[in-house]
């Protein structure tokens, strides 16, 4: 998970805690630039990435595919994601960096407004199709954590405050 797990998005939550939810404001790249890293979780993911080279750190986000560049830029200080090994500050793909470990990155399809539990279940199933076998999941939302816990053999780490949004 990205929002609330790797990045502190609390300053943007006010836009979706009201009725009607203002998803456009919540997803505004100008606001996302102020998302703060949650370094303890980032450090755990980086430790796995660098100390267990046979294993992959796989990223799955409920963010829409159209937010890929913003998301990759937000995480680029700590991670390189498959297909986006090097990105310029303008958000354009640069030359690939072959020596740096990269990570698969799954995102919600564009215009998919289903619940995160449904989307992340499908992302998990796609990971299996792609040959990955996730063993450990970090997430922050109670409903999504419940969904992850229902998958046999998967260890789940709750990094949230028990808050839905």
Enumerate the language-model features and the residues they cover.
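Glycine-rich phosphate-binding loop signature in dinucleotide/nucleotide-binding domains
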Residues: 52-53, 127-133
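Acidic, Mg2+-coordinating phosphoryl-transfer loop and its flanking beta/alpha structural elements
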Residues: 124, 132-165
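Amphipathic coiled-coil/heptad-repeat helices and related helical stalk/stem segments
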Residues: 37-41, 117-120, 141
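Short, solvent-exposed polar/charged micro-motifs at secondary-structure junctions
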Residues: 69, 113-119, 145-147
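Alpha-helical substrate-recognition element adjacent to the catalytic core
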Residues: 1-111
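Short loop-to-alpha-helix "cap/lid" segments that border enzyme active sites
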Residues: 91, 115-127
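Flexible, glycine-rich phosphate/dinucleotide-binding loops
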Residues: 13-15, 66, 114, 144, ...
